[in-house]
Amino acid sequence: MNRALLRAAWSSGTALRAPPSVSRAAVYRSAIHPVNRSFASVSCLQSEQPSSSSSAVPPALEPKDELTGNSTSESTPHIPWYLQEEAPLAESEQTFSRDQIPELPTNPPAILPALLDYVFKDIGLDALKLIDLRGLETPPALGANVIMIIGTARSVKHLNVSADRLCRWLRSTYKLSPYADGLLGRNELKIKLRRKARRARLASRSGTMFDEKDDGITTGWICVNAGVVEETPVKKDESYSFEGFGHTATGTRVVVQIFTEEKRAEVDLESLWQKALDRSEREKQRLSQVNPGAPSEEVRASNSINVSPSDREFGHASRFPTSPLFGQKRLLHTDHRPISQKFDRAAIHAEDTEEALGSQSSSLLRDHDHSDNEKKLRSMDALFDHLSNLSDVQARIELGEGPEDHDSTLFLRLFHDVLSVSSAEEKAIARLVLFCNAISRQHPGYTKRGLYAAFTECTCAGYLVSDDLAFSVVSALLSPRLAGTSSEDVAGQVPEADQELALLVLEHLSLRGTNVVNMRVFDMIYRAVAISPSTTAPDGANDAQTGNKSSLYRVTRLIDTLDLPFEPEQARSLMLSLFQHGDYDDFWKLWRKGPLNGSLRTAADYKMLFRLHADLGDELRARDCVSTWIPMMRREDNPIPLEGELLVDIKRCLMLADPDIVQKAAEGSTSNLARFWNACQMKMLR
């Protein structure tokens, strides 16, 4: 039974030599059943020499007995490692891990401490660094007022998992809408990694090299933009000294940049932003030395358009003195300026101008008490107001022979008298307004090429051309020409060269941030297309008419596709153009769109509606119009009264719908048209 153990014991030479004082049975018993000992901290080689009085103890068993006694008397009971309690760390060692969380900046948002703890403790990002970019013009892709956190993930999988968990935590805890650039979904990442492993196995089996080029799984960099985490509590006063587009950002944004270790060393994002911060600090110091009393200004505006759910070219761009297209010196603005410009030095001759104009029978100026600031405006504004009140023929006479004519008419003499005391910017703007009026009135002495040159002169010099004035330039360029102004012109049409000039102006407006996708612009385009010669249709009147209808159809389809914002005044003008060119379906579509967009119909809308049908002369359309929309006038949120010009237009439509309406009403007819006629008659008698 214990044969193997006995064989091992008897094979030893020392075991065979038993001391004479020990019996053979004792030797067998110790060899077969060895003495059990507990572990001791004393080395097994350490033993004490036996005393002379212990000669009765066998030499072979004496060290074992002594070691056992020492272990029980001198050492504590052994505790396994998995039951041992760890000694408490020193306070310095406890705070060492907390030192990896960066310090909070001044005026941090409330979410920032919790976000740093979550990123460091729960997600496990290393080497965290916080960069406060709220004093910089950050790229629009990040948004304004950014606090950036940079961290390192341990692997590609950790990178994706960290970004995914961070987005879910921001959504569930703070109800934010973060987006992560470069993040793959959980299932998508698993599928791509599985496919990559399969390709590697197939390559190893076939003995070919596996191409480890960029497979689109990850770039080693994920940018988590949490968006606006805190709105600015104090609302700042708006400044109108700059121009541009979009809205001024007021909230603080937090962006978390997560890298793998290799990608972070390659990009070195901290150094790039630190250089930008250093440049900004040097610029502030330079400005403070030039003008110590002037406060530092920060202009930070975001894109978007329409924007995006989160704000969506690039970098801290210096403001060039010229625009990309015309070399325009420009600032940023958030509000429109009026068309009229302030002619400060023109106030010197304001009273003389009024006396000269007051002697005319047309009475160019009205006698009102004006303040000093208004006097600076009224001399030039009064001239253009007087011009706008004249008919086209009279206006062309007042404008003289052309831009080189300075004194042939009283209007030109007064105009150039005001220009003589104006600044260079005021002169350029005034000439541009003069060209717009002349081209719109189809004056043969003023060319559209000259109008475009005047506009280019203003933009290249960096003068402030308001959006309204720029749109007036586009409208003038798209207006029809008179016959005979040049050899290739056709009466009542807009040549392709004029259309190209208008598109250049629209392109400039778009580049400087003006919204050109609106009903006002499409109304001008629609009118120009309707009177433009067809370049795609073959010869012949019918073919040309078919080509124009096709072009108009494309414009209306584009309007429907873009779903333009509804502006009542612009929509009324566009509806007028649609109806006048026979596009009745799109007219009614736009007519019904107003209340759906929260725009109530007014008396001006109904006046336009009934006047258009009365001028059209279509009996069926007139009958449908009065039968449907006269009752609707009383059902509007603000009921439309039957009075004034509206009443006259309704009576015209009624007479067109039923030529015998007067006789039927006198005979006591009870038809709807007769009742409408009687109601109109009663309103007129009151």
UniProtKB/Swiss-Prot annotation:
Family the UniProt entry places it in: Belongs to the ATP25 family.
Full protein name: ATPase synthesis protein 25, mitochondrial
Pfam families (UniProt xref): RsfS
Low complexity bias: start-end ranges: 48-59
Intracellular or extracellular location(s): Mitochondrion inner membrane
General function of this protein: Probable mitochondrial mRNA stabilization factor.
Main location: mitochondrion
Lineage summary: Eukaryota, Fungi, Dikarya, Ascomycota, Pezizomycotina
Region spans: Disordered: 48-77, 280-319, 352-372
Source species of the chain: Aspergillus niger (strain ATCC MYA-4892 / CBS 513.88 / FGSC A1513)
Gene3D superfamilies referenced in this protein's UniProt entry, alphabetically: Beta Polymerase, domain 2
GO cellular component: mitochondrial inner membrane
Coiled-coil portions: none
An annotated GO BP: mRNA stabilization
Alphabetically ordered keywords of this record: Membrane, Mitochondrion, Mitochondrion inner membrane, Transit peptide
Topology in membrane: Peripheral membrane protein
Origin: domain of life: Eukaryota
Transit peptide segment: 1-39
